[in-house]
């Protein structure tokens, strides 16, 4: 089993959601805080899951295996107020966590990673205070040159949906609803 996840994150405030884990993304079920006291962690499926730990600038990677439902990897002291790239690379039972193209943690899983058929969720329960960019998945372990090229490209800085007035979709216009002219052209705002 091999795969790689890559995401750019910008954390700007650790006080947001104080005392709970802050969700970045996970692949699995949608069960955050539904069956237990609110912690911010999804359970049981994290294949993988990436979170910010409570009250510290640490990242938590959770990976399910057939031997252990939650194997946890902590990456300490990630930078605040700047973009960082986080990659989770799995080959067989080895998990490598990269920060900005450098391996910061290597963890040997107790068993084969458990792959689930769940969806990918981002920023659940309000996520974290900051930004996310370019969440990518590959069904193989990326090599060092590919990892470095992703870091060199940097995050996508284009905001999606940041200003609804720029797009001016016609279905927000009331002209089509209130027009009484009988003309389809007038009723639909001049189509």
Predicted regions located by residue number:
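Extracellular glycan-associated modules
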Residues: 1-191
């Amino acid at each position: 089993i091999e795969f790689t996840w890559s995401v750019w994150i910008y954390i700007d405030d650790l006080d947001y959601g104080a005392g709970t884990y802050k969700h970045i993304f996970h692949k699995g079920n949608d069960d955050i805080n539904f069956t237990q006291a609110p912690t911010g962690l999804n359970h049981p499926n994290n294949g993988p899951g990436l979170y910010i730990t409570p009250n510290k600038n640490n990242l938590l990677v959770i990976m399910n295996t057939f031997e252990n439902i939650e194997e946890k990897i902590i990456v300490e002291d990630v930078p605040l107020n700047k973009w960082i790239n986080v990659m989770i690379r799995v080959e067989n039972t080895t998990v490598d966590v990269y920060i900005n193209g450098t391996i910061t943690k290597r963890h040997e899983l107790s068993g084969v990673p458990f792959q689930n058929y769940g969806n990918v969720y981002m920023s659940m329960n309000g996520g974290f205070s900051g930004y996310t960019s370019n969440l990518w998945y590959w069904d193989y372990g990326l090599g060092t040159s590919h990892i470095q090229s992703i870091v060199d490209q940097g995050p996508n800085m284009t905001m999606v949906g940041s200003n609804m007035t720029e797009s001016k979709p016609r279905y927000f216009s009331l002209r089509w609803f209130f027009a009484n002219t009988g003309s389809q052209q007038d009723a639909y705002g001049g189509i």
